[in-house]
Amino acid sequence: MAEPEAHRSGVSSVGVMAVAHLTNDSYAYMLPALLPLLLGKLGIGIAAAGLLVTLYQASSSFTQPIFGHLSDGGKRTRWMAWSGVALSGLAAAALGLAPNIAAVAVALLAGGLGTALYHPVSAALVAGAVPQRSRGQWMSVYISAGNFGLPIGPFVLGVLVATIGLGGSWIIAIPALILAALVWRLGPSAVRRTTAPLSFRAVVAGNRRMIAGLVSVSATRAWASALVSTFLPLYAVSRGASVVDASRLLTLFLLSGAVGGLVGGWLADRLGRDRVIIVSLLSAAPFCFLLAAQDTLGPAFVVAAAVSGMLLNGSFVVLAVRGQESMPGSLGMVSGLMLGLSIGLGGLAVAPMALVAERAGMPPVFVAAGSLAVLCALLMRLVPRPPVGAFDRESRGLELA
């Protein structure tokens, strides 16, 4: 399918990408919502369910830098954005129709690859479409839209299953197909290189210290956030909350993170990227410690959940922009590192803390999350700063396709 030739740049096209991001990420949390139903329908055990979640996480996170590097290669790769969101929706719809565990695994693999296709190239397109002076603000709109989508998917799926049943899951693919068409028609123009692209190995070799620093900070932040989001509802239930109330608490954490992303991006354009990242992370630590100190689910616990979500996830947006400005000649690859690989690494690190929670209870997990936030802020001081004007110099080798 040939893409429209008209150039699409500027902030107007960011709206299309933001809504597509919201739609794409709304499918990410549908699997946890479907698991109880799939366990009964297909006779899947808990261990097998855990492997399925790992399959999705691995395919969606660890392949993003590779797809991002391919999108930096100078060819017309905008197709990755619209095909990625379409594949995510179709795969999520197939989960409810899958007749056996093998079909579920194939659907999850396809959904993970759809997410991996969409994220790095779309983030690079947005970064290239907006003025540098307001890049933090517009990237925060784009990324926060995805964060707003996370709690929407399970809610919509719950209503759909309660009304129609699993057989009606095909309906959830419709928004993805509509947004895929809009991205194809109205999304930002692809970026084409006028200089020869570097190989994956050359990019890594030339930015080894920068990549190590950015991934370390991003993965540590993702670990802290994943600890809170994973154990927050479990801790609430252990303290007498209903499953519904625990889910609401998780939704509050996620939505607060989306709001924090918008605020963080706006502040970063005015106060500086590193300053906002460090202050946000240091400020998040006391609220993580407050979660650990609460024996009841009173107002203090709810406030701590909301503020920790806002600060932990607010810094995520600014970290993504910092990465893009540190490696402007590899926007797709660095977006894959910051939005995919780092989150995947952080998620994998949750398993050891689950063992700690089984032996010592869940408060130490929240203490660990706060400590990781402090460590992350300290690591940020070690990340090399990009040379002044680096983005503008590298951009001379790029042009709209």
Language-model features and meaning:
Residues 329-359:
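A late C-terminal transmembrane helix in Major Facilitator Superfamily
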